[in-house]
Structures are given as C-alpha cells and as structure tokens.
Amino acid sequence: MKKIFMMVHELDVNKGGMTSSMFNRSKEFYDADIPADIVTFDYKGNYDEIIKALKKQGKMDRRTKMYNVFEYFKQISNNKHFKSNKLLYKHISERLKNTIEIEESKGISRYFDITTGTYIAYIRKSKSEKVIDFFKDNKRIERFSFIDNKVHMKETFNVDNKVCYQVFYDEKGYPYISRNINANNGAVGKTYVLVNKKEFKNNLALCVYYLEKLIKDSKDSIMICDGPGSFPKMFNTNHKNAQKYGVIHVNHHENFDDTGAFKKSEKYIIENANKINGVIVLTEAQRLDILNQFDVENIFTISNFVKIHNAPKHFQTEKIVGHISRMVPTKRIDLLIEVAELVVKKDNAVKFHIYGEGSVKDKIAKMIEDKNLERNVFLKGYTTTPQKCLEDFKLVVSTSQYEGQGLSMIEAMISKRPVVAFDIKYGPSDFIEDNKNGYLIENHNINDMADKILQLVNNDVLAAEFGSKARENIIEKYSTESILEKWLNLFNS
C-alpha cells in the first residue's frame, strides 16, 4: 500500500498558500485511500494545540497526521522514563531561594538577591505559558520555557544576549535533545540526541537520520518535499527504493523578471531533478522555461488540488474590491494603493478591503494615510475565513509580481468573483481569459487596471457574467480527478 510523506519546515495556524495546498493534497489522497501525512522539522512546544486548531478550523483534514523530528525523539524519551525529573525543578527553585520578588505588573515579576540586591531572575506568566530568565552580572544567561507548568526548553545566551545553546525536555522533564546555535546567524551546529546517545554534525544530519528511521525504503513509500529549505533533508537520505519528488510553489526567478538570476533553493532543486524521481511545477509555462534554462528532464506539471466549494448564494452589488495575500514586497501592494487612488478619484463609493499580514504592512498603512484614502482603503489583517471574505467582494485584484500558480485568484474565481490581475509569471494567464471571465493587465499598467476595476464595479451584469464564467472555467480546468490521475501516473511510472 502506498504511503505519502509531504515535507515542509513547519506548520502553524496562520500559514496559507503552500501549506493550504498541502492540506488539500492530503485530503484528496486520503479520499483515494492513499494515506498522505505531513513531516515537519522545526521545534514548537505547542504543536498539539496547533494541530487541534488547524483541524477545528477545517484547514487540516481529520485523518492527516503530522510527524515531527522533535516529537519523535520526545516520545522515545517519554516511554523511557516513568517518574518526573524532580531534580530539574529543584534546580530551578533553588536559584529563586533567598530572593525578593518585585511585581512589575500582572504576571510579570523580577527577583533580587535578598543579601546583595543582585538581579537574579525575571518571570513572565500567562494562562498556560511561563518563562524564567536567569541573570548574572545583570546579563541574561538562561531562559527556561514552560507550558502548563512543565519545562519544555532551556536556552543559553552569550554576552551579546543571543541564543547559543538549546536543550529540549520531554513531558517528565528529562532532556532528550541539545544543540549548539551559531549566535551570529542562528544556524544549528552540533546536535546531541541524549535519549539515544547519538551525535550529529548539524540539523541536516539529524533530520536525514530521522527520515531514514521514519520512512520505509520501499517503492510504495513516496516523499514529496514542498518546503524548498527542507529539500536537502529528503535528497540526502540513503533510500534506494522510496520515491522522491520536489515541488516548486513559486517563480524560480530571483527578481521580478527573467534576466537569468535564480533563487538559490529552487535552483538547487531543479539542478538535482534528474537524481530523484522528479520535480513538479504548477504551470506548463514554468515547466517549459525550466527545460529551456537548465539541462534537466524530470520536470512535470501538476496543478495544486483546488477545493471546489459551493458558490455564494448572493451576488455582491456593493462596490467592494478585495485582496487577500501576504503583505510582502513581491505582492506589490504599493501598486494596489496607487490603483485605489486612481479609482477613488473617479468613484468615491468604491472601497478596497485588503486582508493579510507581513513586512510591508506599516509602509502600506502610511501610504494610505499620505494619500488620504482612510475612508476607502481598509487593512483588515489576517483572516482565517477567506471564503467568507470573498462573499463580501464584488471582484478581486492582484498586483503580484510573481506567483507559482496564484491559488488565491483561483479561489476567488470559484466564488464567482472576477479577478483583475497583472499578466505575470506564473499563473494568471492559465485561468483568466481576458475580457471573458476577468481582466489580464499589462504589468505595472495601473491606469488600465483602475479603468477595468471601474468597469466591473459599475456594471453588475458584466461582473456577474464574468464571475459565472470564472467558476465554470476553474471547475473544468482543475478537476480533482485529472490532478489525481497525473500524480498516480507519476507514482506508477
């Protein structure tokens, strides 16, 4: 029986895009009676709560499991020990003896030596979490992190107050992994699996060992690496029979064009395509570009699975233009604000609702203020219910400069919301038929984009017609059956 392991650095409740596509893929494979689970390599003390939240929100299928390198060794340690490590908690409490507590605010206290007045510790508590920082010569030297009053991690700090060493503890308080951290760049150095008495050169070596333990070396074992940073972990295992695939979810070009510079991680995946079973990209245009740019053959086009949900029952007549994405430079939300300015000058009734978080949010907020657009452009923050937000939009706009596919645009079209997007690599031209189910705009032509938005917000019949055709096109182009068939053909080839 086939079993699929999909790899990514981390999972979290506020991850979209690639993570959502992995969740959808897992569900579709499970529906086809092929277990498809997710493997992560980061450390989170609250992963149990994160997985519960993802499943409760309906993002992650109830059948999908998450395997994690730290959880694996933690469980071994849990099974090895029967009693709590009382010495650990005694060690911590002894350091707080003979101190004076000064409460700074609710849940925050500082501790001073009762004899010398020396600053000893800082404690911050919340409902379920607590941290204790210990100081020496007024400099932080250690932090103990607790969840539900149990220590799960200790961090050691250098003289510059940067983490240089970490220790991880099991449910009973016993250390199971410790590792050196490069204080300058955060890179993981020598790692010690205390529970197994093993030493590893770095995090890569540890994760390779873990994958070899987790995944049986059989043709029915299928590894799909979605996270580009995790690819070396899969690539370097000694599996001879298990299948290995890399997936590229983004444009592989370094810049907003195709001048020849490539992203380092994606380039590494592509250059090693012939040494694994294959590399998957999401659009045929990207596959053809890669074949022209690199001396490789094992490149395949398979779209993300698209979740076809019911269309909204009502058509939005209010003049609301929507946008949902990470607020990062590649999305060029600054251009969206310039478009909004042009639109509002001609029709002050139009509103722009922008959902997302990211590094450029403060810059965008200032642009909105500087252009006096506060009554028309609204930053709504991160949303856990994008489909509900789509129901409020009359149309969706994208100023993104490059995509792997453009899943958020596809989701809008499923909801019968026409999309106005710059014609960039890769994605929009695959599913937007200009002047039939949306508009493809010459990149950076903000005047044309503004004009097309005005046409749609002021013509209910046209917007509804485009929206209906958009949904029909997506359902026809991205059927679950055809996408699943491509994967199965690849596995069986």
UniProtKB/Swiss-Prot annotation:
Q: What is the effect of changing residue 138 to Q?
A: Slight decrease in activity
**Stored SUPFAM superfamilies:** UDP-Glycosyltransferase/glycogen phosphorylase
| UniProt keyword annotations, A-Z | Cell wall biogenesis/degradation, Cytoplasm, Glycosyltransferase, Teichoic acid biosynthesis, Transferase
Query: Which residues does the record give as UDP-N-acetyl-alpha-D-glucosamine binding sites?
Result: 17, 59, 249, 326, 331, 383, 403-411
Q: What is its main location?
A: cytoplasm
Q: Out of the domains of life, which is the source?
A: Bacteria
Q: Name one GO molecular function term.
A: poly(ribitol-phosphate) N-acetylglucosaminyltransferase activity
Q: Tell me the Pfam families matching this sequence.
A: Glycos_transf_1
Q: Which reaction does it catalyse?
A: 4-O-[(D-ribitylphospho)(n)-di{(2R)-glycerylphospho}]-N-acetyl-beta-D-mannosaminyl-(1->4)-N-acetyl-alpha-D-glucosaminyl di-trans,octa-cis-undecaprenyl diphosphate + n UDP-N-acetyl-alpha-D-glucosamine = 4-O-([2-N-acetyl-alpha-D-glucosaminyl-1-D-ribitylphospho](n)-di{[2R]-1-glycerylphospho})-N-acetyl-beta-D-mannosaminyl-(1->4)-N-acetyl-alpha-D-glucosaminyl di-trans,octa-cis-undecaprenyl diphosphate + n UDP + n H(+)
The consequence of inactivating this gene is: Inactivation of the gene leads to resistance to serogroup B phages. Disruption leads to altered WTA that lacks the alpha-GlcNAc residues. Mutant exhibits no major changes in growth kinetics, microscopic appearance or antibiotic susceptibility.
List the Gene3D superfamilies: Glycogen Phosphorylase B
The answer on whether this UniProt entry bears the keyword Cell wall biogenesis/degradation reads yes
Which biological process terms from the Gene Ontology are attached to this UniProt entry?
cell wall organization; teichoic acid biosynthetic process
Pathway terms, separated by semicolons: Cell wall biogenesis; poly(ribitol phosphate) teichoic acid biosynthesis
Query: Sorted alphabetically, which PANTHER family does this protein's record hold?
Result: GLYCOSYLTRANSFERASE (PTHR12526), TEICHURONIC ACID BIOSYNTHESIS GLYCOSYLTRANSFERASE TUAH-RELATED (PTHR12526:SF629)
Q: Can you quote the domain comment?
A: Assembles into a propeller-like homotrimer in which each blade contains a GT-B-type glycosyltransferase domain with a typical Rossmann fold. Assembles into a trimer using a novel trimerization domain, termed the HUB domain.
> What family does this chain come from, according to its entry?
Belongs to the glycosyltransferase group 1 family.
What is the protein's known function? Answer: Attaches N-acetyl-alpha-D-glucosamine residues to poly(RboP)-wall teichoic acids (WTAs).
Q: What is this protein called?
A: Poly(ribitol-phosphate) alpha-N-acetylglucosaminyltransferase
Q: Name the encoding gene, please.
A: tarM
